[in-house]
From Swiss-Prot:
Coiled coil: none annotated. Part of the 50S ribosomal subunit. PROSITE patterns: RIBOSOMAL_L6_1. Pfam families: Ribosomal_L6 (PF00347). It comes from the Bacteria. GO terms for cellular component: cytosolic large ribosomal subunit. This is Large ribosomal subunit protein uL6. GO terms for biological process: cytoplasmic translation. Belongs to the universal ribosomal protein uL6 family. Keywords: Ribonucleoprotein, Ribosomal protein, RNA-binding, rRNA-binding. This protein binds to the 23S rRNA, and is important in its secondary structure. It is located near the subunit interface in the base of the L7/L12 stalk, and near the tRNA binding site of the peptidyltransferase center. The keyword Ribonucleoprotein applies.
Length: 177
């Protein structure tokens, strides 16, 4: 039995939710999101509480039960508060700057990397070595952060590269003479 899936989801204040078959819609102060729940999972909306349960006891239905509950909770949290990821840039001459809506990254290549920000995502650069990505869709915010990090992953010897603010880089010692 899923420990996450069996918890009911209460709709936060300021958010309106509708359930139409397998489609869950949420509208809040930050915007509107929807999620199509897998056919293996049942969604019930009673009062101000949404409960999720598997249609049958098959392994496939039970494996998607907890994930469906988490996804529904994430859309409620996203339309109410939004999500944010911070990236840090370490390295001599490594920096970021906004160029219109796009992000210009100087990461030691012979050319600057221009990252086109998808719609629904806001990117700010408070310092040249810090990038803040925010939006209402948790998956999309994480995807943008991962794509920017992928241009120059942190290396283990000097720690140069783009890393998440809360990420700890395992450092290695150089060759001994």
């Amino acid at each position: 039995m899923s420990r996450i899936g069996k918890k009911p989801i209460s709709v936060p204040s300021g958010v309106t939710a509708t359930v139409e078959g397998q489609l869950v819609k949420a509208k809040g102060p930050k915007g509107e999101l929807s999620y199509i729940v897998n056919d293996e999972v049942l969604v019930k909306f009673e009062g101000n509480v949404i409960s999720v349960s598997p249609r049958d006891q098959s392994k496939d239905a039970r494996s998607k039960w907890g994930m469906s509950r988490s996804m529904i909770e994430n859309i409620f949290c996203g339309v109410k508060n939004g999500f944010e990821k911070k990236l840090e840039i370490n390295g001599v001459g490594y920096r970021a700057a906004l160029q219109g809506k796009d992000v210009q990254l100087s990461l030691g290549f012979s050319h600057d990397v221009i990252y086109k920000v998808p719609p629904g995502i806001t990117v700010t650069v408070p310092k040249p070595t810090e990038i803040v990505i925010s939006g209402i869709d948790k998956q999309q915010v994480g995807q943008v952060a991962a794509e920017i990090r992928e241009y120059r992953r942190p290396e283990p010897y000097k720690g140069k590269g783009v890393k998440h603010a809360d990420e700890c880089i395992f450092r290695k010692e150089g060759k001994k003479k």
